[in-house]
Amino acid sequence: MAKTLNSRIPEGPVAEKWTNYKAHQRLVNPKNKLKLDVIVVGTGLAGASAAASLGEMGFNILNFCIQDSPRRAHSIAAQGGINAAKNYQNDGDSVYRLFYDTVKGGDYRAREANVYRLAEVSNDIIDQCVAQGVPFAREYGGMLANRSFGGAQVSRTFYAKGQTGQQLLLGAYSSLSRMVEAGKVKLFTRYEMEDIVIVDGHARGIIAKNLITGKLERFSANAVVIATGGYGNAYFLSTNAMGCNCTAAIQCYRKGADFANPSYVQIHPTCIPVHGTNQSKLTLMSESLRNDGRIWVPKKIEDAKALQAGTKKGSDIPEEDRDYYLERRYPAFGNLVPRDVASRAAKERCDKGFGVNNTGLAVFLDFSESINRLGIDVILQRYGNLFDMYEEITDVNPGELANEINGVKYCNPMMIFPAIHYTMGGIWVDYELMTTIPGLFAIGECNFSDHGANRLGASALMQGLADGYFVLPYTIQNYLADQALWPKLSTDLPEFAEAEAGVQKEIDRLMGIQGKRSVDSIHKELGHILWEHVGMGRTKEGLEEGLKKMKALREEFNKNLFIPGKKEGLNVELDKAIHLRDFILMGELIAYDALHRNESCGGHFREEYQTEEGEAKRDDANFFYVGCWEYQGNDTTAPVLNKEPLEYEAIKVQTRNYKN
């Protein structure tokens, strides 16, 4: 039976909720903290910052990661920057404006109170990272530098060249290492969570697999924190690292944690296009490039055909024959419109035949104007590593002078096209970041809470560090205040034995199928189904067809999967098979949510619901809520939809406008 979920948002004006919450929350006595264990699954920005912060507070932390070092978490791949409302540029920024831009960018589908809190703590994040030694770019006088990202008309993004995620992760890792050395954090590398253990209705531990030995192990704690990222790799081709998966999140869903807004999947507009059928992942080109790069396609269809045939290059087309379509359609924001808007605009041009590569699925990102105006040295100082990465992959140097027409110098433009990048949906959490399972918390990308239907660029790093450094350390105490009275749990309890036996039984089942198809071949088919039917453009008929195909693919997976090797020891194909099992269920969840939401908003675009100009058309009367899906006991039964009504008090809900 459908339920209405309680987000437990504090009373009072939105600007005072977090301050009031902190003033009245329950605390844990310092001596009692020494008795309490917390499991943190994941060592990316959210997980590492949470583990380090909770360890500093005195809690005993068990921290798990699938890599051989926390430094290999996918947060390291983030390029462009991190948002904060410091207003160093004196350009009109404020906590409220960051809050407003984030809610608007999310197409008014985010929880207002959470977003304001995020904007409020953003400035503390920068101070924390500077104190850790993160080498943010600086102006000549020593002040931290800023640049702009999509969906904003101010410069609020702090950055470290094109390697911001790496530097922020090294900062969090240094704090984590300090706690490991102090004995407050016990780090388990090359371990993967396979199940959550529920005791008396509370999350009290996990079953984890040692990825080297293949052995299953039991771990108990007073609370469990999931920080395992998003589910973009369900699509097979994405900008996510190949190890990224949704197994921990899906296991929590199977055990009773509602999954919120799974259809909100972000398709990033600036990625290197697909170049072959055997490709295993895609490469992101940072949104920061849109500060100085201009996106265009030819105005003339004959020029587009020549580009597709390889008889012309981008540098051969003069300025007057270029269509800078984002600047034309959205003059107030130009190339810095939000990601969902830029991606759909690129798709529209390519669908009309104006694509610029041999597949017709690419547009140009051109730096000629900026290089002519500022000089190549300035551009390389800002984006040098990104230019190097692009050249390494494509053998094209986007900073190299390639042609001169009527006195105007033109460089080789980058070719880009939208690709799966980030997931705004995730495990449902309340204001305290606790799921529908008491004692189970979800932070960072694996929860749904802050971005609505579309995340603004440079806000993922902000949310991950906000949750780990400044939100969870407060809110988890409200739960743990009672736990200090509980006895330490033994992993010999029947709930732990039952959970471990369930995982072992599933491993035996997968190893015993002994079919003929590899994990990758089935995963690639799943990705094709999702991209074709649950991708940038969605329809009722397409979603129903996608669901039908995914159900058939599950049967194929269960009958014809082949996993080489044995269950003991290191077996990467077995681990991938477990991930794929969960990606299939995740793909169905995305489709169910997209099918029920008869509107277009942010990253969810139903082609039946659009304006005459091709923009997203929301239905606030019927869909102004968080869609929360509840598992029904097995993977083949359709989930039940629960709802969390959205309430806005500080912002007027209106149609997004990036034109003026």
Predicted feature locations:
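Glycine- and aromatic-enriched mobile tails/lids
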Residues: 20, 26-28, 32-37, 50-53, ...
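Core beta-strand elements of the Rossmann-like FAD/NAD(P) dinucleotide-binding domain
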Residues: 34-36, 214-223, 436
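Glycine-rich Rossmann-fold phosphate-binding loop(s) that bind the pyrophosphate
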Residues: 42-44
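N-terminal Rossmann-fold NAD(P) dinucleotide-binding loop
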Residues: 47
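Conserved N-terminal glycine-rich FAD pyrophosphate-binding loop of Rossmann-like flavoproteins
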Residues: 68-100, 266-270, 279-281
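Conserved redox-cofactor binding core of oxidoreductases
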Residues: 128-215, 227, 271-285, 290
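Glycine-rich loop(s) and the adjacent beta-strand/alpha-helix scaffold that form part
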Residues: 223-282, 451-474
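An anion/pyrophosphate-binding glycine-rich loop and adjacent beta-alpha core
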Residues: 251, 257-403, 474-477
